[in-house]
Swiss-Prot record:
It is an enzyme of class 1 (oxidoreductase). GO terms for biological process: L-proline biosynthetic process. This is Gamma-glutamyl phosphate reductase. Pathway: Amino-acid biosynthesis; L-proline biosynthesis; L-glutamate 5-semialdehyde from L-glutamate: step 2/2. It catalyses: L-glutamate 5-semialdehyde + phosphate + NADP(+) = L-glutamyl 5-phosphate + NADPH + H(+). Keywords: Amino-acid biosynthesis, Cytoplasm, NADP, Oxidoreductase, Proline biosynthesis. It is found in: Cytoplasm. It comes from Nocardia farcinica (strain IFM 10152). Its EC number is 1.2.1.41.
């Protein structure tokens, strides 16, 4: 449900009550069959399409408020819904229905010499909190992935999308009720009171995990202040290293794709490192190609926008890139491991030994050899939909698809065995 606040309403209690209802719902979700979950996802898609006009009307109010507040065009585009985008969101729910159900899957197992049969099986996490910005499509994406993996979702979206998110969540709840599934499997927390985030991320014992999705400021604040376990879907200061043995045609193609395909996403390249052995040829060629695509280049070479340490650690999310000439592979790895965010790193090289060394030494969730950083994506990896790209090392790392929204339990079958004294 959508939790409303008033001047005298206790936001903390509202969040905790929503979490308690989510816990009850999560127990029912964990017992659903794959067919029941898939039917509910298709029903949600159908209900969303039928109520598209309601969603668009709510979104128009959010857009009008954002325009009045002077919101920049790129953020308005992220906030805006259209009939085509709603069609795409509904299609996404159907795609999730078509993905394998991770719940109940056996991770490993064995039969011990004493006859005990041991299996490690996937189970839902339970209650998953999502804190996210602008894009109202995340509301439905998070619901779909949570439902298929058997989790209840507590959603805290942006205040700029408050009316859109409220309309979407009510539609999803309606679809669940029609399928005899607890509507509290998806709830929307108040977005116009910042304290709702604090209460969500500190509701240990009520919420099993919180996943922040958005800019560096949001993610860092959630990870810093949370008591509930978090999964950091991190920022992407991604590098492309042009090695001494690189094919420069390939390097140019990869770099332009990694930087300009969608500069505002976390898997876009933000720094290009060029090996000194090929710098005389590679620098003028690659800088010319970048400029042809409207990219501003920051670096410590003549003709570039002067770079500072801030540039080496910057996630621009714009048509800007930092460029640095490095002495060798060792220097490239050192630079990446110093300034990278652990998201995606790429090397362009024809030297197999260098490629293997790079993949071994670079500390990142995904490492590309002769491929664009843009491929770090659940769908591109063949996993289907994702909730984000985890840059941490515990629980999940890389694209967070359905299996990453589960935990495991050990199930042991016996025939009266007892442990010797």
């Amino acid at each position: 449900m959508t939790v409303e606040t008033t001047a005298e309403f206790d936001v903390r209690e509202a969040v905790h009550e929503a979490a308690r209802r989510a816990r009850v719902a999560s127990r029912a979700l964990a017992q659903l069959t794959t067919a029941q979950k898939n039917d509910a996802l298709h029903a949600a898609a159908d209900t969303l399409l039928a109520a598209a006009d309601t969603v668009l009307a709510a979104n128009a109010e959010d857009i009008a408020a954002a325009e009045a507040a002077g919101t920049e065009a790129s953020l308005l585009d992220r906030l805006r819904l259209t009939k085509a985008r709603i069609d795409g969101i509904a299609s996404g729910l159907r795609q999730v229905a078509g993905l394998p159900d991770p719940v109940g899957g056996v991770v490993r197992g064995s039969t011990l010499p004493n006859g005990l049969e041991i299996r490690q099986v996937r189970v839902p996490l339970g209650v998953v909190g999502m804190v996210y910005e602008a894009r109202p499509n995340v509301t439905v994406d998070a619901f779909g992935l949570a439902l298929k993996s058997g989790n209840a979702a507590l959603l805290r979206g942006s205040s700029s999308a408050a009316k859109s998110n409220a309309a979407l969540v009510e539609i999803l709840r309606e679809a669940l009720r029609a399928q005899q599934i607890p509507a509290d499997a998806v709830q929307l927390l108040p977005s116009h009171d910042r304290s709702s985030v604090t209460h969500l991320i500190q509701a240990r014992g009520l919420v099993d995990v919180v996943i922040p999705r958005g800019g560096a400021g949001l993610i860092n604040a959630v990870v810093r202040d949370a008591i509930v376990p978090t999964i950091e879907t991190g920022t992407g200061n991604c590098h492309v290293y042009v090695h001494a043995a690189a094919d420069l045609d390939m390097a140019e193609q990869i770099l332009i794709n990694a930087k300009t395909r969608r500069p505002s996403v976390c898997n876009a390249a933000e720094t290009v490192l060029i090996d000194r052995a090929v710098a005389d040829t590679a620098v003028p060629r690659l800088t010319a190609a970048l400029r042809e695509h409207g990219v501003t280049i920051h670096g410590d070479l003549p003709g570039l926008v002067p770079a500072t340490d801030t540039d080496w650690g910057e996630e621009y999310l714009t048509l800007d890139i930092a460029l640095k000439v490095v002495d060798n592979l060792d220097a490239a790895v050192e630079h990446i491991n110093t300034w990278g965010t652990g998201h995606t790193e790429a090397i362009v090289t024809g030297d197999l030994a260098a490629a293997r060394e790079f993949t071994s030494r670079v500390d990142a969730a995904a490492v590309m050899v002769n491929a664009s950083t843009a491929f770090t994506d659940g769908e591109q990896f063949g996993f289907g939909a994702e909730i984000g790209i985890s840059t941490q090392k515990l629980h999940a790392r890389g694209p967070m698809a359905l299996p990453e929204l589960t935990s495991t339990k050990w199930i042991v079958w016996g025939e009266g065995q007892i442990r010797p004294v």
